[in-house]
Amino acid sequence: MDRLVDRDISASMFTATSHDPLPTHVRTVVVGGGIIGASIAYHLSAAGENDTLLLESNVLGSGTSWHAAGLVTGARGTTTMTKLAKYGLDFYSRLEQMSGLDVSFQRCGSLSVARTAGRVDELLYAKDVADQQGVRTEWLTEDRYKELWPLATYSGVAGALLLPDDGHINPGHATVALAKLAHSLGTQIRENVAVHKVLRQGDLVVGVLTDQGIVHCDRVILACGLWTRDLAATAGVKVPLYAAEHIHVRSAEIDGAVPELPVYRDLDNSYYIRHEAGRLLVGAFEPDGLPRPVEEIPSNGFAEFGPEWEHFAPIRAKAEGVVPALASAGFDRFLNAPESFTPDANFAVGETSELSNLFVAAGFNSQGIIFAPGIGKELAEWVISGTPGFDSSAVDVQRFSGHQNNRNYLKARTKEGLGRLYAMHWPNLQMETGRNVRRTPLHARLAELGACFGEVNGGERANWYGAPGTSPTYDYSYGRPNWFDRVAEEHKAAREGVVLFDLSPFAKFEVAGPDALEVCQMAATADIDVETDKAVYTLFLNDRAGIELDGTITRLGLDRFLVVTPSFTQQKTAAYLKRIARGKAAAVFDCTAALATIGVMGPKSRELLSRISPEDWSDEAQRYTHGRMVEIADGYAYSLRVSFVGELGYELYPSADMAVNVLDALWEAGQDLGLKLAGYHALDSLRSEKGFRHLGHDIGPIDDPYSAGLRFTISMDKPGGFLGKDALLKLDPTAPDHRTVYVALEDPDPVFVHDETVYCNGLPVGRMTSGSYGHTLGRAVGIAALEPDADLSGDFEVQCKGRLYPAKVSRRPFYDPKGERLRG
């Protein structure tokens, strides 16, 4: 594993320019000369943005790129990630020809091994997604496995998946090749220039302070790996990531270690193996990682830690058990170097919430080589156009909560994060470290009543309930998990009786001031100039008419509005509203922590509320989508008659200090009504049956309202327009780029995850964007995006873990298509 210390292949490229004075102004500064920064610089220049300066504090590739194993693949676990990975794999196959440099790209394939039934399910699911996106796959027989990897035993193998077009590349050489391409298209590159600070004026970046002076610019892109967090902090921006040790060892020479060996991923044993010059390289993604604070990592390039043979011993023993030649050959090199990890094991990409012209691309969780080309391309487009051209929901840096940037929290989470790459990616998987940091006002009481909590972006929420007095835990499955029956009971109670949801994690903002209406009108596609206490469901678009957010806006008064959006969009919602409010006589207040939210849902919700409140709860007193302040329990709360479950329901907004009082009163009063507590898994099941969209799955920044089937949210004629209207006017509402439909399997046994391929008359025509088990319908149900010309009268099937299941497809939800139950 050669370091690029001698710089042979780059010396002729940059000698002529590396000693020139820094420019005083450029359009774009990219900070970080690793493979991510080089890819961004190349893709910017390839798109015509050649007034770009790439700054590297040492030499190109000397941060973390140099020591990466260089594994590349065309498949990941979701459609979006597979598209990004596939682009990267195709790009690397052309990089040598494009750049004229040897990047040692070896297309040897990759072999992923399953040793448990659950892992077999995961690989079959991944195979379905790969097949859907045109990535070649092969499910291996024992004989084929032995043919491809004669050095490995077959003992304990439950299944194996081959991706024949995968391979590996020299990451240092690839970094320099990308930089050469960028340089040839006009990008300026400076090595040995340290950036000390990102400079800002108000809410905008204006330049960077380096050890060689100030460079003024119109925008900055931070792609400096594990140093991104601290550099962003110089401008008051939070980018949560933390370093951990990543270990690989190299064997002595082994007979049979040939270049044709596929990359071997033993996922259940937490290691990979690849060929290297007649030897085998073994790398670990152990479940008990070793976090390292950035202060302990040298900033002068090519940082390494000392050997950790004792820590590596369990992985080594497993690898030697599978490949006995490793034990007999021994190892002649131990490499231990830093990688950076985020709290949820997805990378941090995009425009920051704090500064509208500061972008980041960091925290790649040991997948930077795989995703560098794809993210370079997509972020370049994002920077140029101002909006993402891909579904960025899972990687958008704005998804994180502010407290997740805390170093104590990050250190605890990173110990787990390293191993998450090879750990099981179960549906609804919950992180285990860094928990119980951010809780709702009802958390303790719900724990007493049997809640099993999950976490979204650092916040705890009740996902399902065991019996009161128990401490339920997760037992995951790609089929029916251990909470399936409990959620079925919660679901039934919501449909037939009454349930309580703790919806306090919802992001909540008050917009107030003389220009508050103007701000909300510009933010929302719907007309918000409505009567006081009227709630409106709306979309929030970007400049391309893509859906950035969805939620409700309730008019509280002449110049006061309550905006409620999904919990994971708290930072994004704040940024969206504040940017529109900039320069206007309106303030945006985050009241998420100040207000609890209790969902009282089900046909008996009206009866329950009347027992603890003297108010009139009739339909005439509070109509659907209307709110009011009510006297309830021993205090007051704002009551909003809306429901995400498809039944009569109310959202109560007591102040945080009164929330437990309201919950206790409801719980005590509802026992003879069969009242149950319900969690977010039941909420997902209920909304799937009703066909309500889920932001981040069914709708996102590349989906316009027409394609999403949400045309009813648009008010083209309201005064002043709205953000994204100009782009929306250019679209033909009768010719969307895809068709959103509702899907239900005929077989009652399978369970949807998402991204399953949908077939019509034997041909693939789309994919499931989200799904759950519809306990009222007694089958898996969800939402799909189909090709616009798909024949809805055809015979439909959905592929689940390699098997096709007959399905029904409809333009209208299968449950209560007219929405009569909502209106009570």
Curated annotation (Swiss-Prot):
The protein's enzyme class: oxidoreductase
GO terms, biological process: nicotine catabolic process
Annotated InterPro entries: FAD-dep_OxRdtase (IPR006076), FAD/NAD-bd_sf (IPR036188), FAO_M (IPR032503), GCST_C (IPR013977), GCV_T_N (IPR006222), GcvT/YgfZ/DmdA (IPR028896), GcvT/YgfZ_C (IPR029043), TrmE/GcvT_dom1 (IPR027266)
Single GO MF descriptor: 4-methylaminobutyrate oxidase (demethylating) activity
Pathway recorded for this protein: Alkaloid degradation; nicotine degradation
Catalytic reaction equation(s): 4-(methylamino)butanoate + O2 + H2O = 4-aminobutanoate + formaldehyde + H2O2
Keyword vocabulary terms for this entry: FAD, Flavoprotein, Oxidoreductase, Plasmid
Cofactor: FAD
Modified residues annotated as Pros-8alpha-FAD histidine in this record: 67
EC number: 1.5.3.19
Cofactor: record remark: Binds 1 FAD covalently per subunit.
Inducing factors: Is transcribed only in the presence of nicotine under the control of the transcriptional activator PmfR. Forms part of an operon with purU, folD, nepA and nepB.
Xref: Pfam families: DAO (PF01266), FAO_M (PF16350), GCV_T (PF01571), GCV_T_C (PF08669)
Similarity field: Belongs to the GcvT family.
Function: Catalyzes the oxidative demethylation of 4-methylaminobutanoate produced from the pyrrolidine ring of nicotine. To a much lesser extent, can also use sarcosine as substrate, but is not active against dimethylglycine, methylaminopropionitrile, methylaminopropylamine, and alpha-methylaminobutanoate.
Protein name: 4-methylaminobutanoate oxidase (formaldehyde-forming)
Gene: abo
